[in-house]
Amino acid sequence: MKLIDAGYGNRVSADRIVAVIGADSAPAKRLIAAAKEKFTAIDATCGKKTKTVIVMDSGHIVMSAKEPESIAAAENK
């Protein structure tokens, strides 16, 4: 099982990632709001600005302060 660094010592399983998207778009913000309502949002930002939303196959979303490009590059290694 390969783990991807989500920032600040947090890791997510690369096998379970469905999508890595930027957090600035309106659809991403709606996705975050819906996940918070359903209690499926995981905040891995440690209080920093959310830059990336990682969608997992379980329906959870992980919010990260790392850039989407760096997470996608780590996933492709």
Which residues are covered by each model-predicted region?
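Short aromatic-glycine motifs in intrinsically disordered, low-complexity regions
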Residues: 1-11
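Phosphoinositide-dependent membrane-docking surfaces
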Residues: 14-22
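Short acidic, Gly/Pro-enriched loop/turn segments at secondary-structure junctions
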Residues: 24-33
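Conserved, well-folded catalytic cores of nucleic-acid-processing
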Residues: 34, 38, 74-77
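Amphipathic, hydrophobic secondary-structure cores in small proteins
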Residues: 38-39, 44-49
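C-terminal structural segments of small proteins and small subunits
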Residues: 52-77
